[in-house]
Amino acid sequence: TVQGFDISSYQPSVNFAGAYSAGARFVIIKATEGTSYTNPSFSSQYNGATTATGNYFIRGGYHFAHPGETTGAAQADYFIAHGGGWSGDGITLPGMLDLESEGSNPACWGLSAASMVAWIKAFSDRYHAVTGRYPMLYTNPSWWSSCTGNSNAFVNTNPLVLANRYASAPGTIPGGWPYQTIWQNSDAYAYGGSNNFINGSIDNLKKLATG
């Protein structure tokens, strides 16, 4: 496995050099949420990950989905316009769509399972049409089961980023995916944000970046 981490505006200043020295090789940075929020620290975080003391991270952005508010296509466009796109430079991950509950919002954002699957597909298809890559999907088994009916509609297109924190193993893989591409196993990474592991070697990480 290869160490990585994900960060947001809650970690405005990150010791990327320290994280690299400790073995981290990739970072996923929050870019947007819904169609009205952008991470004010995104540019500095993204640039910091790219130029960390001469060592670079393979890096990408993520979008926190608000499925009940605007269309999947609109949120994909917003994400791409604010740093979430992809390029074939070998160090850019496909964008990640963060699918989970939030605060006082309904657990499934007020959508039926069928409507949620359609929303995710609309986001995914628009992202693919613009960038040439399908986004990674971040979720946990409970949310995916409750909110998509444990849909297997994305198995052949979208890499799975599995959230299963404070566990000794990835555990249940939802949605028919045979394995997780990335496992988020804690929200307390030493250099900020959440702890992640790529499923495989550095070559697997590079392949994820290059497509």
Curated annotation (Swiss-Prot):
CDD domains to which the protein is assigned, alphabetical = GH25_CH-type
Q: What is this protein called?
A: N,O-diacetylmuramidase
Q: What the protein does? A: This enzyme has both lysozyme (acetylmuramidase) and diacetylmuramidase activities.
Is the Cell inner membrane keyword given for this protein?
Answer: no
Keywords of the record? Antimicrobial, Bacteriolytic enzyme, Disulfide bond, Glycosidase, Hydrolase, Secreted
Q: Name one GO molecular function term.
A: lysozyme activity
Which pairs of Cys residues are joined through disulfide bonds in the record? C108-C147
| Annotated GO CC locations | extracellular region
Catalytic activity annotation:
Hydrolysis of (1->4)-beta-linkages between N-acetylmuramic acid and N-acetyl-D-glucosamine residues in a peptidoglycan and between N-acetyl-D-glucosamine residues in chitodextrins
Gene Ontology annotations of biological process type: carbohydrate catabolic process; cell wall macromolecule catabolic process; defense response to bacterium; killing of cells of another organism; peptidoglycan catabolic process
Where is the catalytic site? D6, E100
- Identify the EC number(s): 3.2.1.17
Fetch the InterPro entries from UniProt: Glyco_hydro_25 (IPR002053), Glyco_hydro_25_AS (IPR008270), Glyco_hydro_fam25_subgr (IPR018077), Glycoside_hydrolase_SF (IPR017853)
Q: Which family does it belong to?
A: Belongs to the glycosyl hydrolase 25 family.
The record lists the organism as Chalaropsis sp
Q: Where in the cell is it found?
A: Secreted, Extracellular space
